[in-house]
Design a protein with these regions (language model features):
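Short beta-strand to alpha-helix junction loop
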Residues: 72-78, 135, 220-240, 368-373, ...
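Helical element adjacent to the flavin cofactor pocket in flavoenzyme catalytic cores
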Residues: 215-287, 438-448
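N-terminal Rossmann-like FAD-binding beta1-loop-alpha1 element of flavoenzymes
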Residues: 12-39
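Dinucleotide-binding Rossmann-like beta1-alpha1 core, especially the glycine-rich loop
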Residues: 56-204
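Glycine-rich FAD pyrophosphate-binding loop
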Residues: 31-53
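C-terminal catalytic lobe of FAD-dependent flavoproteins
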Residues: 219, 385-486
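A short, basic/flexible loop-to-alpha-helix module at the beginning of a structural domain
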Residues: 1-11
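Active-site substrate-recognition segment that forms the wall
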Residues: 25-29, 43, 59, 94-96, ...
Length: 490
């Protein structure tokens, strides 16, 4: 007897396509504030397997972008901190360990609250900013390089001081409120209350200078709010919250076709899919949300998305054990001198892994046949840590493919999410951005969803509560971070 040729049909209020941080965060926030039935689809066997699981886990609060000509990306990071504290800290009380603290009497700024089970590690990123006597500037024959490094330094000091120093009180009417773009850009002071360093940082810079046969040069050291974050833990907690609010997940499912209604305003009627068992499935919903990076290109025309996608590859070098216990980034005007070191800690059963992730600002277009060159990362690491210390450890390298959107109006790299919808349609597209911006993209997508779908808004419980069965299910759904997968396979 022939097997039956049959297609399962399923209907829910909202379908979210994409199991990275954006899709999971949107599903979680929507489920927390509504009684809508929500289903999330992911083509991979687990959630968080692509860019969301491969990055170094850098929580960006603006430091890396504080020296750019345009302050918009810096402000996006600062606003992300506001959204995190207002929307997640009160709900995930035991997990989201960033909150306002009283730096001086009645003056509040954001800070990491030490918590071994928290999302954010209590280890700041120290920003190393070179000056005119640094190797990359003193070896240059261009006078403009010395001018440029000073301009960048002034931007960095001023912007970070306004955001996180002694210029802005974040507590306004019992809510967290970030400084405005105008506040940041209008500040002209050069003093910084954030200047700080450690002996480890100073020794590393001394060793770096020495590798160029130079005497110790002058640096501005800044203790930033940036830190390393536990990306897989964040995903697991968000998924646990989703499950507790009735969200269903289907992994290993592939979308074959979007069935569009093109008579009048374009609307999406169904998704025609293949399940991981190879069965046909038709999925229908009141609203479809696409929060997909890799593999989304074939659907751009059908959905009439205006932004273009571009994939780029960057390299990571993993070292075990960790090289030092301090996070730092060298922020130069010369790309080849960019370098960052992050220390991460993970536990697997009774085993504890403390490892370093090394990276720089290098990336290659995904259409290039050549892999990303990791030699510049290794060369910089040799200068900071020494060959013996570096190569006596277990070393691995891997590539991370990042899908980013490029606005057709302005051909440059973007780091924020792009949310696109049509008020007459029934779908929403969220194009990729930084993991750190997940609170903002979840909230902004929610605001857009309210214009497309009528539903009763709910006030969420005072705080997140889980149970063991849901946590076990969430652990199965979310992939381990890529570095941990490397350790487990070697």
């Amino acid at each position: 007897m022939k097997p039956l040729e049959v297609s399962e049909i399923e209907y829910v209020d909202v379908i979210v396509v994409g199991g990275g941080i954006a899709g999971v965060a949107i599903a979680e926030f929507l489920s927390r504030h509504s009684n809508l039935s929500i289903k999330l689809l992911e083509k991979a066997p687990q959630l968080g397997t692509l860019a969301s699981g491969k990055l170094e886990g850098w929580y960006h609060t603006g430091a890396l972008y504080s020296g750019q000509d345009d302050a918009q990306t810096f402000i996006n990071c600062v606003n992300g901190v506001e959204d995190l504290i207002n929307l997640y800290t009160p709900y995930f009380t035991e997990q989201c360990n960033i909150n306002l603290t009283e730096k001086e009497s009645n003056f509040f700024t954001p800070a990491i609250i030490p918590n071994p089970k928290g999302w954010f590690n209590d280890g700041p990123v120290y920003l190393i900013h070179p000056q005119a006597d640094a190797p990359e500037i003193s070896s240059s024959r261009l006078k403009s390089d010395a001018i440029q490094i000073n301009i960048q330094r002034n931007r960095v000091l001023g912007r970070l001081e306004v955001a996180y120093g002694k210029q802005h009180n974040w507590l306004v009417n019992n809510k967290c409120l970030a400084p405005t773009y105008a506040q940041v850009e209008n500040y002209e002071g050069l003093d910084s209350s954030l200047k700080d360093s450690t002996e480890t940082i100073r020794n590393l810079c001394r060793q770096f200078d020495s590798s160029y046969d130079m005497e110790k040069s002058n640096y501005n050291f800044i203790k930033t709010l940036d830190c390393s974050m536990h990306t897989s833990r964040i995903l697991r907690d968000l998924v646990t919250s989703c499950l507790s609010h009735g969200v269903t997940f289907e992994t290993g499912i592939k979308i074959d076709k979007l069935l569009m209604d093109r008579y009048g305003p374009i609307r999406l009627k169904s998704l025609l899919c293949k399940t991981k068992e190879g069965r046909s499935k038709r999925l229908k919903a009141k609203l479809f949300i696409f929060a997909v990076g890799e593999g989304f290109e074939p659907f751009l025309n059908d959905l009439q998305v205006r932004a273009k996608l571009k994939r780029s590859r960057s390299a990571m070098v993993l070292t075990y054990p960790a090289l030092v216990d301090t996070n730092f980034v060298r922020m130069s005007t010369k790309n080849r001198f960019h370098f960052n070191h992050f220390v991460q800690q993970r536990e697997m059963g009774n085993e504890k892994y403390i490892y370093s992730l090394l990276a720089d600002s290098g990336y290659a277009n995904d259409d290039s046949n050549d892999g990303v060159d990791i030699e510049p990362i290794l060369e910089s690491a040799e200068r900071y840590f020494g060959q013996e210390k570096l190569y006596s450890r277990q070393l691995y390298s891997y590539e991370c493919v990042k899908t980013e959107f490029i606005s057709q109006e302005e051909q440059k790299r973007r780091y924020s999410y792009w949310i696109e919808s049509n008020s007459d349609s029934n779908y929403l597209c969220v194009l990729p951005g930084k993991f750190s911006f997940f609170p903002t993209v979840a909230y902004q997508a929610y605001q857009r969803i309210k214009t497309l779908l009528h539903f009763e808004e709910l006030t969420p419980k005072s705080s997140f509560q889980s149970n063991m069965n849901i946590e076990i299910e969430a652990n199965k759904l979310v992939a381990e971070s890529y570095p941990m997968q490397i350790f487990l396979s070697n």
